[in-house]
């Protein structure tokens, strides 16, 4: 096709679709005895895009992975936490199966399966949620519960969570309604006290009350493109009953609440059961026995707990698990740094003793897997600073002494006569 303004005879040309003349449009494209203007081309593109949006959800729903497939995908990125992965796989599968069947099956209304993740910091709560969203190819957003307040107070409104989700999918409401929202630090909005107070708890119980309807399912009115609300404005209507909410928190001290409940009734005085220290359950074993009544005592209101029917507990990561995290997942930390070094033409080797030292440091800091990156970054900082300016470095070797800060990484050069250790 060619761009023409006049035919060979010099006659005025018109768009065959809208009838506008060549003087009313910017471009006129000629085909075999027909013409189309740039405006009609744009309109056709818009129609095709809308058609694709409508077809895409049906295509995604037909390819819903089974719980086994979801679990297998999580295994590629998350080490350990086997029970939590199984619980999540079933809950997520059931949620999207419910959406695919229009919330009903043979006339039976299917309930919503929001999820509560309980586990220490750095145990993989956020990573599990992110990995699920990536597998299902749905919009994902994170919110920090500590920044939320009731409407009308200084802080983030709970509806801002839905606004963030819309931003992730370019304000496509249909796509947002199939998304996943992860609310972190949910334990920090627990009720501050069991006793009623004359001062309003706007960041604790107040936020729980504000989140109730959002999590259960309501039609949230969100201003388009992140604008502020005003009366004359048209709002985007988002049905949150189709959005999967995953709430996570460390719940420090919950193990003591569970322990008190479990041990109550074991007798008092001479009838009490005496337990040795070795007989006492670990924190992970206690958290696995969590009941709604324990969460109520911790400070969550019963209505809020009722909106999170699926509870998964995560264990504190052991030293062996941290070593696995360093080298086994598809996006393992050591693989990431090896890829960075390969861009500079150098091979990066972590000796086993170095991985042990990194895991020991992370255990001592009690930061779980989250602390691994900062330890590796500190050990490699000087090398990453110098390497781009150095020639012929073929290999960088990291051993235990480098992690402990006692020596610098061993640099191996391409030319035998130039081999040297930077720590010498």
Swiss-Prot record:
The keyword Cell cycle does not apply. The keyword ATP-binding applies. Residues 2-56 form the ClpX-type ZB domain. It comes from the Bacteria. GO terms for cellular component: HslUV protease complex. ATP binds at residues 120-127. ATP-dependent specificity component of the Clp protease. It directs the protease to specific substrates. Can perform chaperone functions in the absence of ClpP. This is ATP-dependent Clp protease ATP-binding subunit ClpX. It comes from Klebsiella pneumoniae (strain 342). The lineage of its organism: Bacteria, Pseudomonadati, Pseudomonadota, Gammaproteobacteria, Enterobacterales. The gene is clpX.
């Amino acid at each position: 096709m060619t761009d023409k303004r006049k035919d060979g005879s010099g006659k005025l040309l018109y768009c065959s679709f809208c009838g506008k003349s060549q003087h009313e449009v910017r471009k006129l494209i000629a085909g075999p005895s027909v013409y189309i203007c740039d405006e009609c081309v744009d309109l056709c593109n818009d129609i095709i895009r809308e058609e694709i949006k409508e077809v895409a959800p049906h295509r995604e729903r037909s390819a819903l992975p089974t719980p086994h497939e979801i679990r297998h995908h999580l295994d590629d990125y998350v080490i350990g936490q086997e029970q939590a992965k199984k619980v999540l796989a079933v809950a997520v599968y059931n949620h999207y199966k419910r959406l695919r069947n229009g919330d009903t099956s043979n006339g039976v209304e299917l309930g919503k399966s929001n999820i509560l993740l309980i586990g220490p910091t750095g145990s993989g709560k956020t990573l599990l949620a992110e990995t699920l969203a990536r597998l299902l190819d749905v919009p994902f957003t994170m919110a920090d519960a500590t920044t939320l307040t009731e409407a009308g107070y200084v802080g983030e409104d709970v509806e801002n969570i839905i606004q963030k989700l819309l931003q992730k999918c370019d304000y496509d409401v249909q796509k947002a309604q199939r998304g996943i929202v992860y609310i972190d630090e949910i334990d920090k909005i627990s009720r501050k006290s069991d006793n009623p107070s004359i001062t309003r708890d706007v960041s604790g119980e107040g936020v729980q009350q504000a989140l109730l309807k959002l999590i259960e399912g309501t039609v949230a009115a969100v201003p388009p493109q992140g604008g502020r609300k005003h009366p004359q404005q048209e709002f985007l209507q988002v049905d949150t009953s189709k959005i999967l909410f995953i709430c996570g928190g460390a719940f420090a001290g919950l193990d003591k609440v569970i322990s008190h409940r479990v041990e109550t009734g074991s007798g008092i005085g001479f009838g009490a059961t005496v337990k040795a220290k070795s007989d006492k359950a670990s924190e992970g074993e206690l958290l696995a026995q969590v009941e709604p009544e324990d969460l109520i005592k911790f400070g969550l209101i019963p209505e809020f707990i009722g909106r999170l029917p699926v509870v998964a507990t995560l264990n504190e990561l052991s030293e062996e698990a941290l070593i696995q995290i360093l080298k086994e997942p598809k996006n393992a930390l050591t693989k990431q740094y090896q890829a960075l070094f390969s861009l500079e033409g150098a091979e990066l080797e972590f000796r086993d003793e170095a991985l042990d030292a990194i895991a020991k440091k992370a255990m001592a800091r009690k930061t779980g897997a989250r602390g691994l990156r900062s330890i590796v970054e500190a050990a490699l900082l000087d090398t990453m600073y110098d390497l781009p300016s150095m020639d012929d470095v073929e290999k960088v070797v990291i051993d235990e002494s480098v992690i402990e800060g006692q020596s610098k990484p061993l640099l191996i050069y391409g030319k035998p006569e130039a081999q040297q250790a930077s720590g010498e």
